[in-house]
Each structure stands twice: as C-alpha cells, then as structure tokens.
C-alpha cells in the first residue's frame, strides 16, 4: 500500500485526490499539507500539517497540485534539507528559477513533472510531435479553453504542446511563439506557432492543435469533461514512481510511450 501525501489539498484537484484515494485499493492518503481551512472529511489516521518536513516524513510519495510558491518550498526542502521522497508535480506557471530548482532536485530524488496528468493529453503530445515533424509545410496554431477562474495563461498544457511541436521541427519555442494578433501585422511567418487562451464558464480543459495547409487541415483535440481525470492520472503515476532512481521523468515514462 503506497502512502501518498498531498500538497495543494485545498485546491480543486487536491480535493478530488482526497476523494479518489479513499477508494483506491493500492494507495492510501497519509498526509495533507494545508495553508487554509480544509473543508473535507479525512480518514481518521490522516496527518494534517502546515509543515513541509512533516509532510515528507509522513508518506512514501508526494503529489503536488499547489501554486508555484508551494512547489518552490517543496523543492527547497529536497535541495537544502535532504528530504528524500519521490515527487509528482503538476503545478503550472513555474518561473525560470523554479524550473531550475526542479532540475536540481531531480538529481537527488525521482520527480515526475507534467503540466497535465491526463493520460489522453500524454498521447496527444506524441501525436503532435508526429504530425509536426511529418507535416512540415503546415502552419501550427494552438487554442486552449478553460474556466473563468484559471489564473495562468496560456495553460501549461498548451505550452507543453507547443514545445513538442517546435522541437519536432528543430525550433526554439521562445523564438517562434506568439500569443495574439491585432492590427495590421502583416502575413503569417512560416515558423510561428500561435498559442491562444480562451476563458469562460466552467470549462475543465480543452486543447486543440491545428495544422493548416492549402487545401487541407488537421486538428488534434483533447477535451477533459471531469476534473478527476487529472487526480486519477496523478495517483497512477505516483504509484509508478516509488522506487525509481533520482531523475526527472515525464508522464510518457510512466505510460511507456
């Protein structure tokens, strides 16, 4: 039985993790880290703490669906204080410093980082790589749609999809990405990859990667209809990463893609 701790337990997905773990045969909820009141019923033996060290000491693996500042504290505990538990990190919006901490910590403990824990999105990333490499003359446009409360844009998933598309064409995404068009901007350049964000309603998540050419186009789409798509995926990879060597893993590693 894998003992799982949660960072970000008061968030939308964190709340679903608590529910899903209470019905899992191979894993149990052992600890939750809280920074505000937790409005959930927990198993009696669950440790509730606001101390990162206690969280590490109380589980076999930590799932992180927090904010960038929470992820930074988690990684700092590994780097500076020698905490040695595997991490599954799904926080989006990490800045460059936090990304560097992620790389440094992965030399010390196994870390699986994914901007989206959906198994379908993992397959979509592979399809985008294949299509972008094969259809080199096609223009690439990416549109992501989320609920009105999402605070970062574009989504981490959209940026990951764009990274796969750019890498497949030997391009640096920072050199070719645009986030909007307005006014008399001239014709589209050959290599640019547009990543557009839409916000409204209660959309869980929808990502469309379009490849457009004269006479034909291809659109690859993933739509999440329930948020526990992400919690169930995170639990699956948390079980997988226990016992692995220190390294930075992707969800593709866990799925054998």
Swiss-Prot record:
InterPro entries: DapB_C, DapB_N, DapB_N_CS, DHDPR_bac, NAD(P)-bd_dom_sf. Catalyzes the conversion of 4-hydroxy-tetrahydrodipicolinate (HTPA) to tetrahydrodipicolinate. It comes from Aliarcobacter butzleri (strain RM4018) (Arcobacter butzleri). Pathway: Amino-acid biosynthesis; L-lysine biosynthesis via DAP pathway; (S)-tetrahydrodipicolinate from L-aspartate: step 4/4. It is found in: Cytoplasm. One of its GO terms (cellular component) is cytosol. Belongs to the DapB family. Its main location: cytoplasm. It catalyses: (S)-2,3,4,5-tetrahydrodipicolinate + NAD(+) + H2O = (2S,4S)-4-hydroxy-2,3,4,5-tetrahydrodipicolinate + NADH + H(+); (S)-2,3,4,5-tetrahydrodipicolinate + NADP(+) + H2O = (2S,4S)-4-hydroxy-2,3,4,5-tetrahydrodipicolinate + NADPH + H(+). GO terms for biological process: diaminopimelate biosynthetic process; lysine biosynthetic process via diaminopimelate. NAD(+) binds at residues 8-13, 90-92, 114-117. Keywords: Amino-acid biosynthesis, Cytoplasm, Diaminopimelate biosynthesis, Lysine biosynthesis, NAD, NADP, Oxidoreductase. The active site is at 146 (proton donor/acceptor), 150 (proton donor). (S)-2,3,4,5-tetrahydrodipicolinate binds at residues 147, 156-157. This is 4-hydroxy-tetrahydrodipicolinate reductase. GO terms for molecular function: 4-hydroxy-tetrahydrodipicolinate reductase; NAD binding; NADP binding; oxidoreductase activity, acting on CH or CH2 groups, NAD or NADP as acceptor. The gene is dapB.
């Amino acid at each position: 039985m894998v003992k799982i701790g949660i960072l970000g337990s008061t968030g939308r997905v964190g709340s679903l993790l608590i529910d899903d773990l209470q019905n899992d045969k191979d894993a149990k909820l052992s600890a939750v880290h809280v920074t505000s009141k937790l409005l959930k019923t927990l198993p009696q033996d669950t440790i509730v703490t606001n101390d990162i060290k206690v969280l590490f000491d109380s589980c076999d693996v930590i799932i992180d669906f927090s904010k960038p500042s929470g992820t930074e504290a988690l990684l700092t505990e590994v780097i500076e204080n020698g905490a040695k538990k595997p991490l599954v990190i799904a926080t989006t919006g990490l800045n460059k410093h936090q990304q560097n901490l992620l790389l440094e910590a992965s030399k010390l403990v196994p870390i699986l980082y994914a901007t989206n824990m959906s198994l379908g999105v993992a397959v979509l990333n592979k399809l985008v790589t294949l299509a972008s490499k094969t259809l080199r003359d096609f223009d690439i446009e990416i549109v992501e749609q989320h609920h009105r409360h999402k605070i970062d844009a574009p989504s981490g998933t959209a940026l990951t999809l764009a990274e796969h598309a750019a890498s497949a064409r030997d391009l640096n995404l920072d050199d070719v990405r645009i986030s909007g068009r307005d006014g008399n901007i001239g014709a589209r350049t050959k290599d640019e990859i547009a990543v557009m964000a839409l916000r409204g309603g209660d959309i869980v998540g929808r990502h469309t990667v379009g490849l457009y050419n004269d006479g034909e186009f291809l659109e690859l789409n993933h739509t999440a209809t329930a948020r526990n798509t992400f919690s169930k995926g995170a639990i699956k990879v948390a079980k997988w990463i226990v016992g692995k060597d220190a390294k930075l893993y992707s969800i593709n590693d866990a799925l054998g893609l």
